[in-house]
């Protein structure tokens, strides 16, 4: 009879070892060396020694947790948030901001095989102008409102959040009190807060109809707090209760948006990012510029203030329409927006027949692997690639380098201080 054996699991002895950390990865984990391989230890910083317990032992690397820290790095900070270490929102509040930026820049430089020329950053606290807080009301218990625990669907009841814009952070206890007073608390899903140029927005998701009394209470609350309130009974429906249509500023232009539309979370970094893109592209009065994955025009419209003509291309029809409206609202008549499948050959479209001098693209995390060959066909002089995923950026960059482009500028965008998120932008020039 045949006998079957399962593969042996690599068993760790759980022994305590003493190590010294010599590096910090972009996720805020300390990196030491043990048995000839990298050992990742959350919570430790470079120059710190600790007694640690191995929790995972792989062929190429291992992981450990701290049993006892033996000394403190001069770059260690006291976390400002009482929920740090439990809430999944921030991972690096114990790390000095300079060290955070250096470690992210080093990780980006390794991936791109190019030095980081610029760090684009704003204030490390109070920067987040958008947040979604989960809501839950267990039977016979108070309403829970907060963010998810790290690695869990459980909610951390958040009383304060130092990375939120101050206007939003100040609202948290009053929003909690208002929502807890409703009769339909068990039907509340989440609340989104946005600090726009037009003021504060509150979007309340609920899974069953709210009573007239609850709606009236919410409307009174919105008026007393001076915020715009929107109800979302279903995923595709948005009901305006109070307030005006929101807008935000991009390089001196006013961009209207729907409360659910994507806008960059960090306003200060977004403003610098747009300005740097214009500078790197060296947009001139005679240029034709193409903006791919353009959204509602965050880059497109500022580009149109300098270029002869700009084409914005986006895969979401509602954002294309919003871009057109924003162009009209800002008196820009040299910009056109088109809805296209960006995986298809955009060079065959009528609007591309005259070519483009400069190209900007700002894709989602999946990157733009299907788009690169079409960009190469256009033979632009300069390309700026804005990325929220350094791995896909490095992959897509290879296509441009192989086609004769060279990385001439690389910037790390510190869009999300105290987290492991790493964003960047690159300038490619045709050689």
UniProtKB/Swiss-Prot annotation:
One of its GO terms (biological process) is rRNA base methylation. The keyword Methyltransferase applies. Its EC number is 2.1.1.190. SUPFAM superfamilies: Nucleic acid-binding proteins, S-adenosyl-L-methionine-dependent methyltransferases. It catalyses: uridine(1939) in 23S rRNA + S-adenosyl-L-methionine = 5-methyluridine(1939) in 23S rRNA + S-adenosyl-L-homocysteine + H(+). Signal peptide: none annotated. It holds the Pfam family TRAM. It is an enzyme of class 2 (transferase). The active site is at 388 (nucleophile). PROSITE patterns: SAM_MT_RNA_M5U, TRAM, TRMA_1, TRMA_2. InterPro entries: 23S_rRNA_MeTrfase_RlmD, MeTrfase_TrmA_AS, MeTrfase_TrmA_CS, NA-bd_OB-fold, SAM-dependent_MTases_sf, TRAM_dom, U5_MeTrfase_fam. GO terms for molecular function: 4 iron, 4 sulfur cluster binding; iron ion binding; RNA binding; rRNA (uridine-C5-)-methyltransferase activity. Residues 10-68 form the TRAM domain. [4Fe-4S] cluster binds at residues 81, 87, 90, 161. Keywords: 4Fe-4S, Iron, Iron-sulfur, Metal-binding, Methyltransferase, rRNA processing, S-adenosyl-L-methionine, Transferase. S-adenosyl-L-methionine binds at residues 264, 293, 298, 314, 341, 362. It comes from the Bacteria. Belongs to the class I-like SAM-binding methyltransferase superfamily. RNA M5U methyltransferase family. RlmD subfamily. Catalyzes the formation of 5-methyl-uridine at position 1939 (m5U1939) in 23S rRNA. This is 23S rRNA (uracil(1939)-C(5))-methyltransferase RlmD.
